[in-house]
Amino acid sequence: MQQLDIAPVQGADHGFDIAKGNPIAMLFGPGYALQTVLLWIVFFCSLMNLFLFAYWLPEVLHLGGFTPAEAARASSYRDLGAIFAVLYLGALIDRYGPDRALALHYAAGIIFIGAIALFAMPYLLLSVVIFFAGMMITGSQTGANATAGKLYPARMRTSGIGWALGIGRLGGIAAPVLGGYLLSLGMHPPQIFFSACGFALIAAIATALLAFRGQRAPVLTPQEAAE
């Protein structure tokens, strides 16, 4: 900048979210430790549930007597439900808060996944149930990202979201491993598919605890924001 004869502006706010210090220490610092643990549980269980749901749905449908083409077509309604969820979830989060909205979605997802695993249904009704299951479970992962963004102040937001996404990916990796292990124990695919409800339940409880705690990103003074 000296060669270009440009003098830097003293004290200018460049808009960068730069957190000083150890990011992990900040995430587990006073006022943030509990919400960080709960958020990590939400992300881990959310992707465990999502991948168990996605991997085993076609097999469950095939064992239910549907042809591979019918199973593939019915599975596609899961993605349509996820797309529809994105369209309205933002407004719902703005109105009720991300944690309350997600807790409700995970709880409803348990009902729809359990119905697919436990009950024989005609194809049309099954397609509708799969649509709502995808809307509640797959679409909620988008809302989980919004939850992470609202729990931390700006100086910690990048670290908070990044670590939560990383923990969630561990759940995505563990899901097929768990499915294979349960299969080796003699569990049938519908039973493995039903196990996804357990992770949805844990995610619902964790998001409900976040809502009950009512923790939000604190308002920082200019001096605190500059640290």
Can you name each region flagged by the protein language model?
Residues 28-87:
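Extracytoplasmic gate region of multi-pass secondary transporters
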Residues 183-198:
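A membrane-interface helix-boundary motif in multi-pass transporters
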Residues 100-115:
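Structural signature of the two symmetry-related core transmembrane helices
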